[in-house]
Amino acid sequence: MRFFIDTANVEEIKKANRMGFIAGVTTNPSLVAKEGRDFNEVIQEITSIVDGPISGEVVSLNAEEMIEEGRVIAKIHPNMVVKIPMTGEGLAAVKVLTEEGIKTNVTLVFSATQALLAARAGATYVSPFLGRLDDIGDDGLVLIRDIAEIFETHGIPTEIISASVRHPIHVIECAKAGADIATVPYKVFEQMLKHPLTDSGIDKFLADWEAAKK
């Protein structure tokens, strides 16, 4: 399973990319708005940092406008992926963009049927939302497993991006469930990096080294 970072914060992207485990970036209108910067400016800077897929999301709700927005996003950089909401209009846009050779990421997926429809429409990626399903008492990991099984059974090349990842356990369970990618907030990466036994082990090594020098 590969890692994308789910943020539009350039400093977070730089810090994560420096550690070598980031393969791409996902953004959405909320994340970009949080930065208080121009969308194109933010995306251009991100593409200069990470050499991998960068998802930028449309804000229109009808297919024709999504297609036009998608074409504009795709022209920003060859690594751009157009993020499209899981609706009938969204899938109509995915079909056209796919035919034009533009990569798409269908977002806000909450069922295996939605994922299958998106894949058959030509989506490069589907993004099932793990944490938001957990919030309403559903099991997001069952959804990941179901989608992975369906895609494998039918030889569907669409990749699964686990989204709405809230904590390190989500990450491990997504990897076990068959997700191709987990898109993870920087704060969760920070949690994944740390373990109290690692810290105490480092302290002991340093203490032993200092004692040996005396």
Swiss-Prot record:
Its EC number is 2.2.1.2. CDD domains: Transaldolase_FSA. GO terms for biological process: carbohydrate metabolic process; pentose-phosphate shunt. It catalyses: D-sedoheptulose 7-phosphate + D-glyceraldehyde 3-phosphate = D-erythrose 4-phosphate + beta-D-fructose 6-phosphate. Pathway: Carbohydrate degradation; pentose phosphate pathway; D-glyceraldehyde 3-phosphate and beta-D-fructose 6-phosphate from D-ribose 5-phosphate and D-xylulose 5-phosphate (non-oxidative stage): step 2/3. InterPro entries: Aldolase_TIM, TAL/FSA, Transaldolase_3B, Transaldolase_3B/F6P_aldolase, Transaldolase_AS, TSA/FSA_arc/bac. Keywords: Cytoplasm, Pentose shunt, Schiff base, Transferase. The active site is at K83. It is found in: Cytoplasm. Signal peptide: none annotated. GO terms for molecular function: aldehyde-lyase activity; transaldolase activity. The keyword Transferase applies. It comes from the Bacteria. GO terms for cellular component: cytoplasm. Transaldolase is important for the balance of metabolites in the pentose-phosphate pathway. Belongs to the transaldolase family. Type 3B subfamily. This is Probable transaldolase 1. It comes from Listeria innocua serovar 6a (strain ATCC BAA-680 / CLIP 11262).
